[in-house]
Amino acid sequence: MRLISATSALLLAYLIWGSRAWPLIHDAPLMHYVAWLIAQGGVPYRDAFDMNLPGVYLLHLAVLQVGGAGDLAWRLFDLAWLAAIGALLWAYCRPVSDAVAAGAGAALFGLYHLSGGAWRAGQRDFLLCLFLLAGAYGVARGLEQPDGRLAFLAGGLALGAGMTVKPHAGFFWLLCAAVAAVGARRAGRSAGRAGALVLGGGLVVPALVVAWLAGRGGLAPCVAVLTGYVLPLYSQVGRVSVLGATRWHAWGRATFGLLAGLGLLGLRASPAWSPRLVLAALGALYGAAHFALQGKGWEYQLYPLALFLCALAPAAVARRADGSRTRPAADLRGIRRAVALAAWALLVLVLGAKGVEAREPEWIAEKARRVAALTRDLAPLVRPGETVQVLDTTGGGIHALLRLGLRQPTRFIYDFHFFHHPDDPRIRALRAELVAGLAAHPPAAVVVFEESWPELGYDRLAAFPELAQALERSFPLAVTGPGYRIHAKRSDS
């Protein structure tokens, strides 16, 4: 195991060094832009139509306030968050394995993260992992201590913070409360108090965030977006099956096949009741549901599953689990550890190969060049105080506005809302809002990106005739760039 650990550490250092120049890219600039709007006095959901929860904006706002909107600040934040997860993962796994195996588990998660490439840096599901693991750790410590009230409460607080990033974390919060109650009763303590502390702690941070949102005037718009769009409409867009999604994840099936195998071996090596392994196993089940329920098939939504499988894996390679000998029936006739070591070594090789492939992919470089080109093209077209409307998803349009410090005349930071469920009255209302906003407050330019989601190509505007007519009437084509078109406002409009 020491050889595998040393190899993992060297590979991790290599990937960290290789990631030092990763740019702020893909989804992250969108969340940065919403955070920037908030810093400028904007109101979430009223001034930025988005599907994410306020906790995401607050984290990005903290990054902007401390380090600014540049690539380096984002890179340092992502690595610091990864280091925090790694340290907590080591502390979580150490009592059910050994120091070397726990360190290897932390390195394994680091390899998983860095093997994804620049676009996965700071993704919301990755940020969620720290809160999920802190919650599980708090509950485990509460069961291990004679008086675990503060630990139960701290675990609940962490899980509540996670729910402000992704609401699906609420399922794991309930599971952790149940484990706290069952474990406390097994120890002859109050099950109700243990569960209530986790549940009560989980309400604190969401309540504070809701209060902040209400104070900013964003609570009603948030509820309207969630109930009028996200739940009934967005949740149905682009849904794919779990197996179908993993076909286009690079090394995805190999990675999770090996991780799942290590997790199962870790469970087989455990005593009948180990709160840390029980919580990790439930976390893995939650992680699978977290991916399946979202239904989009995006690779970064697998982070919680990867996290908890990495938490289970060290027990599979430790010579002893929980300080006791492994049960003979669980040892697979004496070859459990050898099988686990072989699987671990293969997984490190797989993640290394994936990481090398993802270090400098052409599509990331192309997107960065597109952002730079659009920034140059827009700068001479926009006077101080003017706005620009972008019709894009993650192509880089909003990123260019962030660099230039430009606002939009409407709240729409994406355009995909307008092209699914076109006959639904709620989508028609969003379309009408966009066209009315462009007419009431004409921007200096409208930027149409060729790539969007789920519809591709400039021809998608034909399905939105009111917008196409508005562009033809008031915003003639001025610049054709790499993957975008800039329609500048007529001088007489």
How should each PLM-predicted stretch be described?
Residues 87, 251-287, 313:
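Hydrophobic, aromatic-rich transmembrane alpha-helices
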Residues 89-111, 129-130, 145-150, 276-278:
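Transmembrane-helix signature of polytopic, membrane-embedded enzymes
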Residues 94, 99, 135-154, 181-184, ...:
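Membrane-interface transmembrane helices that cradle and orient dolichyl/undecaprenyl
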Residues 141-160, 189-200, 275-285:
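Short hydrophobic alpha-helices at membrane interfaces in multi-pass membrane enzymes
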Residues 150-167, 173-178, 203-204, 284-292:
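Membrane-interface alpha helices of multi-pass inner-membrane proteins
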Residues 171, 288, 294-330:
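Hydrophobic/aromatic-rich transmembrane helices and adjacent perimembrane loops
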Residues 172-203, 267-271, 319-325, 330:
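Perimembrane helix-loop-helix junctions
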Residues 174, 364-421, 434-457, 487:
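Short periplasmic/luminal acceptor-recognition loop of GT-C membrane glycosyltransferases, typified by
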